[in-house]
Amino acid sequence: IGEVMGIFNKDTRPPFSGLKGRSPKELFHTLPTPCYILDESALQKNGQILAKVAQRTGCKILLAQKAFSNYNLYPSLSPYLAGTEASGLYEARLGAEEMPGKEVHVFCGAYREDEFSELLCYADHIVFNSPRQLERFGWLAKNAGKSIGLRINPECSTQEGHDIYDPCAPGSRLGTTRAQWDGQMTPRLVEMLDGIHFHTLCEQDADALELTLKAVENLFGDILPRMKWLNFGGGHHITRPGYDVPKLEQCI
């Protein structure tokens, strides 16, 4: 599977050109410390895998800067991605400045009123966490020409062993449940939306996505046809050897 998907392992990975063909182990004593050593050729290979998924499905794949914000390598990733995902003002600015010409998508659990106007200078898509948040900030974003989304909670847990990080765990305040939607989303707020967003996975395979999508369709299926886009969130371990790329593409 690794060869079919074009994924390197430790034996087939080419030398990192920045180290002139030598392994990092050979040069440890000459490197400044502490430091990170990144294999740019492997990074680009992963980018190619993502770009092929986007080409075959028509989806957009974004760089989650919360997970990787080494902006020196943004030029290496930019050709393969539609843009960046940010969790606040400074990540949005980073994506806009270091990956120019690409989209900037923002989701934040809580937006600061004193930062929101500046955030609008960088963001293309803004996702809100709750109907109340949407009501407070949505029209400011809409009038600025931004694409507006709402994060939903499909109430479908696919993770084991770390409930504290599970957005679908009981009591989670991340995303809007269907009950909250029915009780708080007025026709005026629904009309404001361009899309909906969910984020429930963490380094998981396409099986978990497939299960989550069934829950999304079950709870929000009547909403989906009225939306322009659906954001699958992060946590998809697409470049991992053995990841079921065909199933991912079928889900999309």
Region locations from a protein language model:
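A glycine-/small-polar-enriched, mobile loop at the entrance of the PLP active site in fold-type I
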Residues: L31-E40, C59-L63
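Acidic, low-complexity proline/glycine-rich segments
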Residues: V4-R22
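Acidic, glycine-rich loop-and-beta core segments that form the ion-binding/anion-interacting portion
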Residues: L213-I252
